[in-house]
């Protein structure tokens, strides 16, 4: 158990903890309504749900920016300093308590800069935006969503101005997802990917498609669900604390210390989509379950929260790509899929089907090689929308042009294009780079894991993935917000974050897939 969860006394520190706990309860209610909106709520309930979420957002903001909260922080800081100077704390307690206070004070300042009216309006706009996005996506009609998107952009720009953090608009909005990230650093990290990924995609485009990928096949929804349930069981699912549902866009969410939810979706004609989405979202959930001290009393302390969304993505990508898409995994699972109706006659069939190299339109269904290009396009476009004057009405055309240039494909309609993701409908500008940063982090952490306990594929081959989870539980999950993403990577791997491990991994896997696609020489 982490030392920081022990209160310094029953006085200021305990009162602060009780206040944070009540704030977290409100946040949990808000998350529960979000879960319901995405999984079960009837479409006509959107307006009322918007009012509910707006009220909760204003109440949360009031608590997170109140003079009472500020006073509790001042008292807790004084109590901490007194105990530190008196030598009453262990060195680790000093470091961890100081970090908790630093993060709470930082979050308080950010909340105090925001107008409560703007907070409420944003909550309403996000709920309405999601409803409009659903309608627009179903009808492949961007014009239905455009006014809601413009409203969200205007509100987010106003939010960035109010925060006045000496950052650009996009940087300011990205901070909740990637603390301390700057555009300059993002451009530095993404530059080698912009240069190398298009060449790798073009190289792979000429390959012959594997038999399993070329065959048109599907599995019944209940069959897909059964395979997903079997996967989660093998990967240690505890039915008493987890719940799985369906939604238009897969996601994972934590509603409480013992309440972890995830969703998946069934895509007609893409029978592996549901399985891989489940693996991905379960990786998110495993990370949440492994964060420090998930108990009712301490759930809300900063050090018990996720480091960043890029670290979150690194964990989901590890389980999806390093485990579920691995050759040893296919060796174990292809008979189960074949028995369920898949046209697999050997492990290679399933492995190639799990790893198609075929640049397409959809980010969620993208292969590992072209995925980064999807993120580069979205990152550039949201920066253009927020900072460079790209008109909302021009977004579909600009989207289609960039897809043609980078991926060699063009959407037939808006649903295949700029309406495919939910993020902008919820005002989540600054989120998309976390996906690609997550790939970089996952690759570098996987190298560190390999050096420590052997390659992940070796453990998968032995049929025991628990050592992989144990290593992550020991070295990654417990860090919480004690560090930012880049500090975590350097602490665990011993090297600054770079693209080297990720590009090396892609090129190695590309070579193996290419060899597997060649006809046998007789």
Sequence positions of predicted segments:
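A well-structured
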Residues: 2-179, 507-519
């Amino acid at each position: 158990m982490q030392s920081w969860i022990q209160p310094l006394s029953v006085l200021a520190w305990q009162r602060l903890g009780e206040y944070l706990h009540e704030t977290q309860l409100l946040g949990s209610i808000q998350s529960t309504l979000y879960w319901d909106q995405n999984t079960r709520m009837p479409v006509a309930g959107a307006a009322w749900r918007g009012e509910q979420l707006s009220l909760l957002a204003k109440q949360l903001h009031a608590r997170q920016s109140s003079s009472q909260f500020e006073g509790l922080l001042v008292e807790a800081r004084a109590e901490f300093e007194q105990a530190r100077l008196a030598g009453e704390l262990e060195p680790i307690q000093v470091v961890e308590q100081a970090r908790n206070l630093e993060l709470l004070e930082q979050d308080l300042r950010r909340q105090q800069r925001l107008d409560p009216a703007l907070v409420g309006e944003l909550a309403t706009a996000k709920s309405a935006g999601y409803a409009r996005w659903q309608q627009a996506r179903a009808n492949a009609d961007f014009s239905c969503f455009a006014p809601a998107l413009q409203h969200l952009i205007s509100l987010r720009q106003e939010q960035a101005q109010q925060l006045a953090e000496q950052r650009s608009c996009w940087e300011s909005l990205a901070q909740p997802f990637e603390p301390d990230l700057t555009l300059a650093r993002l451009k530095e990290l993404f530059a080698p990917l912009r240069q190398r990924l298009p060449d790798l995609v073009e190289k792979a485009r000429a390959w012959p498609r594997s038999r399993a990928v070329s065959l048109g096949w599907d599995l019944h929804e209940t069959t897909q669900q059964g395979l997903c349930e079997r996967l989660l069981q093998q990967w240690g699912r505890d039915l008493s604390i987890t719940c799985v549902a369906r939604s238009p866009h897969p996601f994972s969410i934590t509603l409480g210390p013992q309440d972890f939810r995830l969703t998946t979706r069934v895509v007609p004609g893409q029978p592996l989509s549901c399985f891989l989405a489940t693996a991905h979202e379960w990786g998110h959930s495993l990370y949440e379950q492994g964060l420090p001290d998930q108990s009712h009393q301490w759930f809300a302390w900063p050090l018990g929260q996720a480091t960043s969304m890029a670290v979150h993505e690194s964990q989901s990508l590890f389980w999806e790509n390093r485990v579920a898409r691995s050759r040893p995994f296919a060796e174990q699972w292809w008979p189960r899929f074949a028995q369920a109706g898949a046209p697999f006659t050997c492990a290679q069939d399933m492995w190639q089907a799990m790893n198609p190299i075929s640049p397409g339109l959809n980010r969620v269904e993208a292969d590992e090689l072209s995925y980064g290009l999807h993120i580069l396009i979205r990152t550039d476009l949201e920066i253009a929308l927020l900072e460079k004057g790209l008109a909302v009405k021009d977004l579909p055309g600009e989207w289609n042009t960039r897809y043609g240039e980078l991926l060699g494909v063009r959407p037939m309609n808006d649903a295949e294009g700029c309406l495919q993701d939910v993020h902008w409908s919820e005002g989540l500008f600054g989120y998309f780079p976390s996906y690609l940063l997550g790939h970089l982090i996952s690759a570098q952490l996987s190298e560190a894991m390999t050096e420590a306990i052997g390659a992940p594929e070796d453990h998968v081959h032995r049929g025991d993935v628990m050592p992989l989870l144990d290593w992550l539980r020991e070295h990654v999950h417990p860090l919480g917000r004690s560090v930012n993403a880049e500090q975590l990577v350097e602490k665990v791997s011993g090297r600054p974050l770079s693209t080297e491990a990720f590009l090396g991994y892609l090129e190695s896997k590309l070579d193996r897939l290419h060899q597997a696609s060649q006809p046998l020489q007789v």
